[in-house]
């Protein structure tokens, strides 16, 4: 069994590496574009990854660990260690399936880009880094995958490097993620110094009697940076400056879920530390509500979907705080399908409307782009947790776990409100984009009759509909489920979703009777300005630092050193002596008479006394 798992994953890595290795050859091995090879390699890898998945589900195995010694440094060893358990074996096919669809869509979306082959290789490296992170069984190997997705996100977000906004967004992503990386590096240093090992299994065993609050805080900081939790979230909506396929891959199954996956993988360290669990719970609750609030008033179609991603990541962090990592992993898997489909639908709409992203300038697309409109509707309903779509199976389970837990009721209320907000902005997106009459230029090249558009959306739509049922049917519960529950608690998630839909319909009706150009609702600007985070963090703080630095340089260097201590001070001290010495040389008779009188007085005193 071990041989089959090792061979399958080795074959996956080899298949994914072939397009990268062949591109290093000075001679072209085949005149066909390498972008097709990348898509084909990911497709083949997906079917290979199904072999260990079916065997794993059939045999009911726990996990398989494979070690190869890499480096010896006295008592501290670094190994190449792969862990094939439920998380890695189930996540890998999901990531490959979603990436296959995104790459096929990118063949159509990026066909005019002169560097499309390099673009596809970057996406492939992005995927390989995520698979390395998911299958890693030691912290060093996990860190390689962690940094891999970080650097590839920088290259892909800033793909259109001639645009200032794209460069700024790429730098912003790197800086915010570097803050999180500091937490991961410090945690790894603490583990190496106190436990003398980076092997995850050994860390679980050796840390039984240790106080792990400090390294776990570092891990939470790392997850907050990579998964865009509150405080380190501004880079996620800014990342929409990259191409739409990048946004789809970034938000569905790679980088943004890496932070949550880190906490899932190391959850045995967290499960008994109440301080860290409470931190995750409160951080996730604030994140999911704040970002859902920001999504309510956005007009950029990609930013609405981006904030919905951040809100769902907050929901996953809440689930970590509830001590339910398997539910967080379930939501990662189901979320990947409909979130990738939402981004691909937005890319299809943007491409068809001459790169227009403002939903106020859309409308009436349900007749012009029927397949894209249907997919967008299915994805939005899955996002809201509509029954029997994939999002329902994970979101409903999370809300049930919160309702039946004895933990923070405040976090529960925030999460329920955020769930209602999810329904509001999802229906708002559908209403402005697909309904009513067209509000765009009639000369837009609207066309979705391309297999490279329809096939990816079709596959992701299938996943958004049935993936939740398939995964929950084969995912064994890690903890005892709640056997009895009142109907009100059972239906709470559905009730708040329906409440949000009704509220969204009421708000859309109010827009027709609004006579003032600017909204009169007092909190509109708070939501539309992203909680004033960008002005405060990116403008006010640098301005304060600049003014403080100028004040210090002016007062400390110019006034204190130059005027009170340095050259000017020396000059001022010499002025009285200079005046005293130059006074007798000015040619005044009274001065000469005074000197003569003093001289005669001294002579008389010396001679006669």
Swiss-Prot record:
Gene Ontology molecular functions: NADH dehydrogenase (ubiquinone) activity
GO cellular component, one term: mitochondrial inner membrane
Keyword NAD recorded: yes
Segments crossing the lipid bilayer: 4-24, 44-64, 89-109, 119-139, 140-160, 173-193, 212-232, 244-264, 275-295, 304-324, 327-347, 373-393, 407-427, 451-471, 485-505, 589-609
EC number: 7.1.1.2
GO biological process terms, semicolon-separated: ATP synthesis coupled electron transport; electron transport coupled proton transport
Entry keyword Transmembrane helix: yes
InterPro entries attached to this UniProt entry: NADH_DH_su5_C, NADHpl_OxRdtase_5_subgr, ND/Mrp_TM, NU5C-like, Proton_antipo_N
Domain of life of the organism encoding this protein: Eukaryota
Pfam families: NADH5_C, Proton_antipo_M, Proton_antipo_N
Keywords: Electron transport, Membrane, Mitochondrion, Mitochondrion inner membrane, NAD, Respiratory chain, Translocase, Transmembrane, Transmembrane helix, Transport, Ubiquinone
Protein's job: Core subunit of the mitochondrial membrane respiratory chain NADH dehydrogenase (Complex I) that is believed to belong to the minimal assembly required for catalysis. Complex I functions in the transfer of electrons from NADH to the respiratory chain. The immediate electron acceptor for the enzyme is believed to be ubiquinone.
Protein's UniProt name: NADH-ubiquinone oxidoreductase chain 5
């Amino acid at each position: 069994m071990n041989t089959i798992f090792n061979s399958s994953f080795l074959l996956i890595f080899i298949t994914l590496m072939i397009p990268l290795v062949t591109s290093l050859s000075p001679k072209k091995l085949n005149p066909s574009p390498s972008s097709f090879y990348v898509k084909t390699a990911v497709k083949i890898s997906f079917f290979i990854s199904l072999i260990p998945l079916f065997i794993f589900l059939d045999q009911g195995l726990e996990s398989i660990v494979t070690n190869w010694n890499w480096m010896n440094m006295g008592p501290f060893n670094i190994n190449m260690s792969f862990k094939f358990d439920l998380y890695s074996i189930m996540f890998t096919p999901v990531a490959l399936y979603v990436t296959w669809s995104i790459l096929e869509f990118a063949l159509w979306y990026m066909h005019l880009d002169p560097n499309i082959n390099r673009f596809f290789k970057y996406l492939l490296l992005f995927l390989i880094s995520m698979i390395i992170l998911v299958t890693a069984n030691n912290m060093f190997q996990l860190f390689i995958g962690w940094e891999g997705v970080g650097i590839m996100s920088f290259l892909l977000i800033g793909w259109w490097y001639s645009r200032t906004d794209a460069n700024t967004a790429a730098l912003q992503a790197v800086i915010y993620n570097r803050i999180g990386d500091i937490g991961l590096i410090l945690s790894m240093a603490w583990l190496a110094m106190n436990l003398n090992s980076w092997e995850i299994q050994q860390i679980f065993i050796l840390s039984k009697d240790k106080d792990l609050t400090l390294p776990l805080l570092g891990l939470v900081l790392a997850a907050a940076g990579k998964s865009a939790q509150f405080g380190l979230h501004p880079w996620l909506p800014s990342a929409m400056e990259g191409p739409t396929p990048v946004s789809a891959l970034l938000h569905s199954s790679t980088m943004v879920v890496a932070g949550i996956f880190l906490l899932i993988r190391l959850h045995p360290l967290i499960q008994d530390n109440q301080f860290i669990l409470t931190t995750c719970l409160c951080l996730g609750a604030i994140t999911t509500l704040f970002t859902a609030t920001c999504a309510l008033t956005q007009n950029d179609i990609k930013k609405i979907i981006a904030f919905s991603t951040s809100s769902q990541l907050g929901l996953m962090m809440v689930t970590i705080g509830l001590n339910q990592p398997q539910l967080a992993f379930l939501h990662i898997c189901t979320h990947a399908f409909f979130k990738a489909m939402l981004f691909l639908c937005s890319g299809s709409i943007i491409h068809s409307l001459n790169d227009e992203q403002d939903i106020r300038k859309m409308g009436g697309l349900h007749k012009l782009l029927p397949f894209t409109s249907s997919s967008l509707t299915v994805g939005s309903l899955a996002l809201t947790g509509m029954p029997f779509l994939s999002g329902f199976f994970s979101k409903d389970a999370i809300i049930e776990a919160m309702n039946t837990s004895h933990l923070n009721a405040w976090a529960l209320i925030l999460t329920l409100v955020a769930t209602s907000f999810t329904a509001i902005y999802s229906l708002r997106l559908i209403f402005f984009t697909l309904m009513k009459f067209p509000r765009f230029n009639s000369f837009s090249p609207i066309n979705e009759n391309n297999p490279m558009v329809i096939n990816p959306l079709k596959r992701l739509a299938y996943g958004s509909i049935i993936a939740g049922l398939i995964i929950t049917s084969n995912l064994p519960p890690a903890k005892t489920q709640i056997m009895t529950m009142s109907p009100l608690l059972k239906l709470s998630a559905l009730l708040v979703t329906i409440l949000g839909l009704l509220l969204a319909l009421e708000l859309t009706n109010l827009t027709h009777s609004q006579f003032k150009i600017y909204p009169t609702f007092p909190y509109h600007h708070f939501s539309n300005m992203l909680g004033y985070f960008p002005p405060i963090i990116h403008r006010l703080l640098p301005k304060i630092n600049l003014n403080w630095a100028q004040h210090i340089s002016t007062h400390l260097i110019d006034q204190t050193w130059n005027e009170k201590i340095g050259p000017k001070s020396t000059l001022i001290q010499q002025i009285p002596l200079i005046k005293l010495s130059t006074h007798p040389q000015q040619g005044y008779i009274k001065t000469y008479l005074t000197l003569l009188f003093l001289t005669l007085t001294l002579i008389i005193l010396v001679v006669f006394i």
